[in-house]
C-alpha cells in the first residue's frame, strides 16, 4: 500500500525555497509484505531486487500528481530522460522515463488510481498493482485488512460507511492495542437513535470534496487587478480543510488540498501552480461546462447537427475572415466588437429551439480516492508501542512528531532531473552580461536591471506561448478533420477569438525590448517603448470579454466530439505544452496584462529621479489600469449574460413567470447564487431533499429545487419569483441543528496534531435567514446556511440590491407633511387639500383641523383646531360653490369655506345637516353639473341620493356666521336611485354613473335609472371573472378613450363598448389594494403595507413605497378642486426619534410626468 511520509516542519507557500525543502521530506512509498522484493535504486541509476519491502520514491509534483509504472522491463535507467514537473518556484520534482512509464490519468500525489484485478495482486512479477473492492467488502469488514496488506492502491470512489461500519473496520486491525491516527479521527458510535451528521472520513477524498464545497464560500476575488467570479483564496481553502479534518496543522491541510488539486477539483486562476496557503493566490473550481440539452447531440465525429451555437454567421466580404484569424501580421483585420453580442444572440436562438434531451452531465467535478497519510496502518502487527517495518507508517510519523524529530527522506541524495529547455535558460540579468558590467553599477541599478530583464524575458515567453497556440492548436485544427468542416472556422474564431491580434502587437513589443537589451547591456529606459505600444492594447479587452464564451464552447466541443477530446489529450501531453492544459494558455493574455503594472512598478521603484522613466512609467501604468477596468467590466457582462442564458434553459416555470423575469433583457443581472436548506437539521443528517438553489437577480429572488423532468435536470421554481422591493430579510437566532449531542472526550490529552478524541461529531450549527414576503399572498420562509459568512453575504447582497432598486426607481417622491405629535391623544381619519394645495383640512376623532403649507418644502405648519365634531371620516371641498362637505357619524354636513378663515373656533351649530345614514359620499362632474352622491348602502340594497349644487348661490359670500346659509341650501336633491346590491364605489361619467359592486361595474342612467353591466357579456375573455367571487372593484379611470378597471386582485382595459382591449395587457397586483389613484403614466395601488406603482401603458412594476397601515386620503383628481394632490396616511413608527410624519404627499417630478391622458 502507498504510504506518505511528511516532514513535520512548516510548509511556507510564499517561500519557494522553504517549500522545496519541506517537500524533500515528503515521499510516497509502495510497501508490500516481506515475501515480496524491493526495487532499490543504485548509484548507477538501475533498479535491482531486494528481499525487503518495496519502496519507490516519487516526490510531490506541483503540476501533475500522476504516478508512473514500468510497462514491462524491471531494469532501466531513469536518468536518461526526466524533466521538472513542478510549477514556478515550487521546487518539487519527479523523475520519469517515457520509454518505460505510462501515465495514469487519475492518479494523484497520494497514490489514488484506477483499480486493477485481484489476479494481478497475486503475481509477484507485477508489483505495481491495484485492487478494487465493493461496498459489501467494506460493510462486512471481511476484505479490508487484506486489501490494506496486499494492495498498492484502493479503488475510488470510496463508499460512505453506514452506521457503525467504521468500528467494524477498526476491529480487524488486531495488532492495534491503543488508539491510533484513524481511530482518533473517527468518532465512536453509540446506540442512540437520534439523527447524526454523516461522518466525514478525512482520508476519503470524495467525502472531503463534498464537504469542502459545502463549507467554502466563493465569491468575487481580485488578483493583479483582475476580478475573478466564484473564486476563493488559498488560505481560505486551507482553513476549511483544517476544519473538516479537525486539525490545527496547516501543513497537513495544505497537503490534503493538493490531493484535491491534483485531480483538478480546482485550479489556480493562472493555471501556473498548485494550491498555496496564501492570501494572494486565487483559485476557482473546475467546472465541466456541459452544453444545454439539445446542443450536445453530436456523435463522435461531431457532425450530427449544424452547430450555430456561440458563433457569428459568415457575411459576404467580411473583414474578419478565417485567414485573418491565423494571421499575426501588422495588418490583421479588426474583429468586430459585436462578436460577443452576436454570439450570445446565437445562444438565445439555439436555446429557443431545444427539444427534449437526456439529462446534461453534472457541472461539478469531485475527486475520488484515498489520502493515505490519514489512514490506518495496514500491518496487523503494528501498534503504537511496536511499529512495523514501513518507514512511511503513520504511527512512525506520529511518533516522530511527538519527539519533534525530523522525518527523514528515503533517499539521502534525492533524485536528479533534467529540466525543460525553457527552464534551463538563464533568468538573471547578471548571468547574461559580462561580469565587468555588473561590477560597474551600484546595487540599486543592479536591482533595476534585473527587473527590466524580467520584463523582457517574460514578454518573450508570452509571445512564445501565443505562438504555441498558433502552431499546435489554431493551424492544426484549421487543416485537420478534428472539427467538422461546417463548424471549424466558427469554432476557432469563438475559442481563440482575436488572440493573433494580441500576438501581432506583443511580438513587436518583444522585438523592441530585445533589441534594446542587445544594444544596451544596461538598459536606460523602457517607458518610451511601452508608451508606443500600450495604446494598441485594445485587443486585450475584446479577447478578455470573450473568454467566458471561449471556455464554454471549448468544454462543449470536448464533451460532444470524441475526436477533439482525444486531440486535446494528446497535445496537452506534448513536451511543448509543458504539462499545461489549453485553458492555462488561453488565460495568459489577460493575466499578462495584469502583470504589467506589477513589473513596471518594480522598475519605477529603483529608477533615479532624473531618468525619463519616472514620468513615462506612471503614465503607462495608468493606461494599463484603465484597460484592466474596461476588461473587468466587459468580462463581467459576458459572464453574466452567459449565466442568465443557462439559467433560462434550466429553469422550469410558468410562461407568465418567465415573462416576468425577462432574463433576455440586456440590463438583467445575476448577482449571487448558492444553495441553502429548508431545515436546519438537513446539515446534520445529510438530507439533500431540502436543498434550495437561490438565484439573486437584480429584480427578483428565485428559490428553486432540482427536479428531473423528461430525463432532464432542471431548476423548478419552489415559489413564484419574489420581487426584491417586497422582500424583508432578517436573521434567525442561531441554534444548533438537531443531531447527536457531543460526548465527553475519552482523554483530554491530544498528542497527535491531527487527532481528536473519540466522540460523536458535534452538532452542525445552522445559521438561519428569515424571508418575509409582503403582499396579498405574503408568506414567511426560513432558510439555513452552514456558515456565518454565507448568511451575511446573502443578507448584504439582498439589502444592497434593494437600496439600488429604490434609488434607481425613484419615480414618486414621498414627503412627510404632518407629524403625529400634532395629534397627541387623537387619530387622523381623513384629509383634503384646497386653495391650490396651499391649505389642508384634517378630520380626526375629535374634530376638524386646518393648516397652511410652507412654500419651501410643502410641509405643514402646526394645525389649528377649528371645529369640534366627533369621528369625521370624510372631507370634500367644492371650491366653485365655496362649500365644505363633512361626513361624521354617518351624517353628511355642509359648511361654507369662508367660515374657516375666521380666527375663532367654529360652533357646531353652524353646520347644516344634509342627510343621514350615509356610508360614503362622492363628488363629481356629470351632465354639465356638479353632483354630490350620498351612498346609503346595506348588504342587500343601496340608495344613491344625488344632490346638485345650486348655481344661484355660486360664489356668494356669507354675511353672517350665525346663519351662514341664510334660508337657502347649497345642495338640492337632484334624483334618487335604488340598487338591489351593495355599492362599493361610485364614478362619474359624462352623462351616467358607474357603480362598483361585488358583481362588478354597472352603468346607471340618471334619467331613467336603467342598469346595465359595463362589461359586455358576449366577450368570452371575461370568463375568468365568473370564478372569482372574492374580488371587488376598486376604481375606474378613463385613459385615452378606454376605461382602466381596477379590481382588488388585478386591472385591465375595456373599450367604450365593454369589450376587453389590449388583450396582452394585464396587471396582477402584488397586494390587495384598498384604493387606487392615477397620475399618468402611472397607476398607484394603495395596500396597507405598501404602495404599488406601475406604468399604466406597460403594466411594469416601477416602484414600491413601504409603510404601515397605509390609507389613501385623496386620489388627486382635481376636476373640482384645482391642483389635486395625492395624500396618504401611515401609522407612526414606534419609538422613533425626531419627526414622525403620518401624512405624506406623493410628488411626481416634472421629468417623470407625461401629462394628462384623459
From Swiss-Prot:
This is Rho1 guanine nucleotide exchange factor 2. Keywords: Cell cycle, Cell division, Cytoplasm, Guanine-nucleotide releasing factor, Phosphoprotein, Septation. Residues 825-1120 form the CNH domain. SUPFAM superfamilies: DBL homology domain (DH-domain), Winged helix' DNA-binding domain. It comes from the Eukaryota. Residues 42-141 are annotated as: Disordered. Residues 670-805 form the PH domain. GO terms for biological process: ascospore wall assembly; division septum assembly; fungal-type cell wall biogenesis; positive regulation of regulation of ascospore wall (1->3)-beta-D-glucan biosynthetic process; regulation of ascospore wall beta-glucan biosynthetic process; regulation of cell wall organization or biogenesis; small GTPase-mediated signal transduction. Residues 45-63, 97-108 have a biased composition (Polar residues). Stimulates the exchange of Rho1 and Rho5 GDP-bound form into GTP-bound form. Controls septum formation, cell wall synthesis and localization of F-actin patches. GO terms for molecular function: guanyl-nucleotide exchange factor activity. One of its GO terms (cellular component) is cytosol. The modification Phosphoserine is found at residues 746-747. Residues 68-81, 132-141 have a biased composition (Low complexity). Pfam families: CNH (PF00780), DEP (PF00610), PH_5 (PF15405), RhoGEF (PF00621). It comes from Schizosaccharomyces pombe (strain 972 / ATCC 24843). PANTHER family: RHO1 GDP-GTP EXCHANGE PROTEIN 1-RELATED, RHO1 GUANINE NUCLEOTIDE EXCHANGE FACTOR 2. It is found in: Cytoplasm. Residues 447-634 form the DH domain.
